[in-house]
């Protein structure tokens, strides 16, 4: 049992180190040597747990999906389906991007190394479902296309990733948290920015 726990901790250290390396340098430029150095483990320990850099990236994605799924369940229990839940969900995604390197890394992997089971697919179906529910319950104005709103949500979360990565690197400390910025953007979108004549 002790050996299994130690093995699990070692594996988790490697996944975290891979997430840091991928977040900072991207998948292509990430090296197993730097991952081992950051984790303070040998290449032998890495190859015991993972056959390749791709396997490590898959483990990062899996951890990010698990964190995201847990957060989505929390949001779903606290809000009625529809736009309110959508706003809170995207805010929580932004918060995860800002605070969890494994999530930021998985988001970067979407661009660097697309594949099945990416981070986007862990939350995009919920966004689509919430927008269909918002349309059914007439929260959306007639003529508002849920697919366009889905694209907007994806763009907002993708933008949140950019700001989260910048803030992780020491961006302006006077800027509000990324989740707060995203919620303010939703307010502008939902209220409209144009004054009526």
Mark where each language-model region is.
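All-alpha amphipathic helical-bundle segments outside canonical DNA-binding/catalytic cores
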Residues: 84, 118-119, 136-154, 176-180
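Basic, helix-initiating cap at the start of DNA-binding domains
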Residues: 1-25, 32-38, 54-58
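Short, basic, alpha-helical segments at the C-terminal edge of helix-turn-helix-like DNA-binding modules
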Residues: 62-68
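Short secondary-structure transition hinges
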Residues: 91-135, 139-140, 148
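Hydrophobic alpha-helical connector segments
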Residues: 59, 70-99, 103, 115, ...
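DNA major-groove recognition helix of helix-turn-helix
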Residues: 50, 60-61
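C-terminal peripheral helix-coil segments that are non-catalytic and often amphipathic
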Residues: 121-137, 156, 162-197
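Short hydrophobic/aromatic patch on the recognition helix
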Residues: 39-50
């Amino acid at each position: 049992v002790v050996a299994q726990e130690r093995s699990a901790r070692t594996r988790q250290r490697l996944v975290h180190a891979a997430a840091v390396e991928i977040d900072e340098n991207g998948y292509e430029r990430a090296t197993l040597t730097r991952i081992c150095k950051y984790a303070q483990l040998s290449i032998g320990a890495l190859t015991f747990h993972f056959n390749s850099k791709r396997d490590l990236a898959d483990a990062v994605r899996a951890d990010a999906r698990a964190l995201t799924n847990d957060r989505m369940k929390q949001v779903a229990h606290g809000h009625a389906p529809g736009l309110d839940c959508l706003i809170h969900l995207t805010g929580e995604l932004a918060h995860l991007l800002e605070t969890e390197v494994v999530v930021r890394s998985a988001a970067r992997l979407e661009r660097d190394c697309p594949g099945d089971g990416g981070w986007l697919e862990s939350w995009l179906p919920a966004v689509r479902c919430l927008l269909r529910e918002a349309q059914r319950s007439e929260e959306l104005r007639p003529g508002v296309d849920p697919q366009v709103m889905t694209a907007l949500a994806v763009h907002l979360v993708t933008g949140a990733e950019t700001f989260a990565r910048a803030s992780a690197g020491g961006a302006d400390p006077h800027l509000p948290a990324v989740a707060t910025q995203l919620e303010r953007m939703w307010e502008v979108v939902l209220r409209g920015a144009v004054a009526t004549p």
